[in-house]
Amino acid sequence: MNYSHDNWSAILAHIGKPEELDTSARNAGALTRRREIRDAATLLRLGLAYGPGGMSSLREVTAWAQLHDVATLSDVALLKRLRNAADWFGILAAQTLAVRAAVTGCTSGKRLRLVDGTAISAPGGGSAEWRLHMGYDPHTCQFTDFELTDSRDAERLDRFAQTADEIRIADRGFGSRPECIRSLAFGEADYIVRVHWRGLRWLTAEGMRFDMMGFLRGLDCGKNGETTVMIGNSGNKKAGAPFPARLIAVSLPPEKALISKTRLLSENRRKGRVVQAETLEAAGHVLLLTSLPEDEYSAEQVADCYRLRWQIELAFKRLKSLLHLDALRAKEPELAKAWIFANLLAAFLIDDIIQPSLDFPPRSAGSEKKN
């Protein structure tokens, strides 16, 4: 990050006017007094220096701030200010996405929204302390939503507000609990979620057990297949009555099926577990559950939509490799939130700044008109 004053003015122009930042910071409780830090823009600048700025400690940030006449305060004072500013940084990041959504809103047809989450661990490794849940638009190649929770908060398809013009796409982590899928089955948005052959309570329309392996074995070799199933509540009556869904089995090509089965055997061998023969057999297929009607979306179209899911995985990798989101420096909860939100704000700003250059193809040397 370039720390020059000219560069900061350009960055600030993408976030908001100084007086607007002052108001939002006061409303969020981030700027209760102006001693040492004169305004909200300065507080934000210090937060970005500590987060995506790459500075290794609060002491380094305060030394840089004094050297460049940004602010004069101790590392302890900065710690208190950044802890109080955590929620405000999150609000600024959310506002950046809200402006983006207003500009790039869907104009026709269904909008695809990929959803996934990633774990963030505190310094020293060990178990993850935070989980970052995010939505991603594969059309604009930009994030659309985010929510930060502790690591105990499970994945949910309904975490973000639903709209009738969207299709949510998620991996098997979202397809292991019927209540997770039910929220969209009776909601506004459609869904495509990958499932495990034993991950849900599969029922027939009559309420009898659905023979998943019989269904897979009945498919023509190398051909896709589909049927309508009922999703049971896994014995939890409070979860509601069974609901219908469209089950699609996508047959993998022989070489990819072999890779899938080899990976499955390797992972279970490493964990000291024995793979069931049925599980190994099912690994030759990708099982998708969807609410999309058959007369509007063929099985192949549903599979094509799901194949776009790699984009959000790649986006998470960019956050971790370029902004080092997985290198959390803070252990104290509020300071950790401030660090994560500052990094997200920087990532969203970078996307917005470079997006105009991606909207038009570069002009080739031979495209100039000759006079």
Curated annotation (Swiss-Prot):
Keywords: DNA recombination, DNA-binding, Transposable element, Transposition. Pfam families: DDE_Tnp_1 (PF01609). One of its GO terms (molecular function) is DNA binding. GO terms for biological process: DNA transposition. InterPro entries: RNaseH-like_sf (IPR012337), Transpos_IS4 (IPR047952), Transposase_11 (IPR002559). Belongs to the transposase 11 family. PANTHER family: TRANSPOSASE INSL FOR INSERTION SEQUENCE ELEMENT IS186A-RELATED (PTHR33258:SF1). Involved in the transposition of the insertion sequence IS421. This is Transposase for insertion sequence element IS421. It comes from Escherichia coli.
